[in-house]
Amino acid sequence: MLKNLLSSRKGEGYIDMCVGVVVFVMILVIAINIFSFITLKVEMDQIAGDLIEVATYAGEFNEDFWNADSYNLEQYYDYYVQYGADEYFNSSYHRVQLGERMWVTVSKDTYIKGLGIFRIPITVSVTKSGLSERYWK
């Protein structure tokens, strides 16, 4: 009886359909994750562009830079900011001389969603750079 049950092909279409649905759902989850990561990257590119624009215009990482950072934090989501310059004119004030390179890195820790109890961490980061537009005497 068990041998007849195992060799029976009556439920084959049902199993194929279930496997097909599971594969389709997994492909859909992957597509949604890729789309959300692309959207996150575009938003972070906008944030980094805003921050480097403020920093290069002022020629330093001052209150205007941190005010722009606070504004972006209110508009978007929590993220990490790293900043620096190739060479500082005055390192105590984080001032950068005209024509020197300044950079801002914005990063966000997130997870791949839709995998149930499995949490796969992903760090998305964007780096923008620009030249200081201020001459310091």
Describe every region a protein language model picked out.
Residues 2-66:
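Alpha-helical assembly-interface signal, strongest on the long, hydrophobic N-terminal helix that forms
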Residues 4-6, 92, 109, 123:
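Exposed boundary/loop context
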Residues 33, 93-95, 117:
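Residues embedded in well-ordered secondary-structure elements
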Residues 46, 50-105:
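Short amphipathic secondary-structure patches
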Residues 107-137:
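Low-complexity, S/T/G/P-rich flexible repeat/linker segments used as non-globular hinges
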